[in-house]
Amino acid sequence: MILEMKNIVKTYGNVVANNKVNINLNKGEILAVVGENGAGKSTIMKILYGLEKPDSGEIFINGKKMNFHNPSDSMAQGIGMVQQHFMLFESMTVAENIVYKNEMKKGVFFDYKKNIQMVEELSKRYMLKVDPNAIVEECPVGLQQRVEILKTLYQNADIIIFDEPSAVLTPIEVDE
């Protein structure tokens, strides 16, 4: 089992967002958390990604107890998240956003050619067509969603969390 969340409780004042939630995930599994608005789905995902702290409960990754203080802690354990609200640098290119913090360099400089090639290969492998040279703020929201997904895939995450993955997509983009 790569992920185990035991008895997770999260409250906001008198509002209970999560009440003793248990989640188990094995390698290769896909898990969907379904519920009404306000049911606590995003809260449990944010807890796993280190954006929120549970009031009580335990999280285990590959059998090891974890305490995530921030997304960097979560990412270090192989957890990536495609957020409902994009976390992109609008003035940068698609490629720069995808490889940010893990970019290939030529000496101390950004190796633009290698990074573009890597993004093209990643895009082709996952059939998520993007223009690596496009400026993010000029891209439609459906394309920005693809950039978010490719950015997470580039990090080689073992666990990928999607929060409302199709919320901003057109029906055609969802089918793609």
Whereabouts are the PLM-identified features?
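Glycine-rich phosphate-binding loops of nucleotide-dependent enzymes
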Residues: 1-176
